[in-house]
């Protein structure tokens, strides 16, 4: 069984966990160590259970707590060369440099590091495989390139960024430069882009989609839910919404795509 959980998803901090029966992986940690311990407790995870930490990129909402949590967990950090050159992992326990678009294994979980367009030094996102089950984690990208589209085909569960409603962003309070950054090709996916990615998958659309990195200023769970409504009915797809405050509890899915909450 392969399962996934999050202790928070959004611009104030991100941390996602993917686990098999034998291996527990943490993807990013944008929370201070003490806060992270409290958040892990909410999903019944002991920090010592974390076998490795995979970093997507060097922005503080993803990397801010990684070095401290690595030391506390005694877990190695996996990151690209570009991410390592940011200097934000100083004091980390053990670092393993990975290549973009590479495949490797940690314990009994196979990992693919996928290059994505984002305004960071060498950003990647990840696909995880175990016992014929695939979980994709895909946030912090400004567009869905053909390469990204192909890499995430055939996932059973997909954590996908629905960052902003473009109209809400344009009329919102952000400075003009930040609006251009967020909406640009190296920024964040807007809701329509994320929906378009799912629709392009056709019959291979994941049975379960987790909408994540939802901006608290520029969209809402209700807006994303309304947008996804027709696809949910047509594809009989399960949708879960990751929040900034709590993320989402452990879930897995069976071959039919049915969602199960797991401890």
Where on the chain are the PLM-derived regions?
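Conserved beta-strand hairpin/beta-sheet module of binuclear metal-dependent hydrolase folds
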Residues: 1-43, 124-140, 157
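Structured catalytic core of nucleotide-sugar glycosyltransferases
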Residues: 5-15, 58-66, 71, 84-86, ...
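Active-site neighborhood of phospho(di)ester-bond hydrolases with catalytic His/Asp-centered motifs
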Residues: 27-30, 50-58, 78-81, 136-140, ...
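Active-site metal-binding motif and surrounding structural segment of the metallo-beta-lactamase
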Residues: 34-79
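Active-site environment of divalent metal-dependent phosphoester hydrolases
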Residues: 59-63, 84-86, 120-121, 143-146, ...
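Metallo-beta-lactamase
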Residues: 79-133
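Cap/insert and terminal regions of metallo-dependent hydrolase folds
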Residues: 146-243
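Short, basic/aromatic-enriched C-terminal tail that caps enzymatic domains
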Residues: 235-263
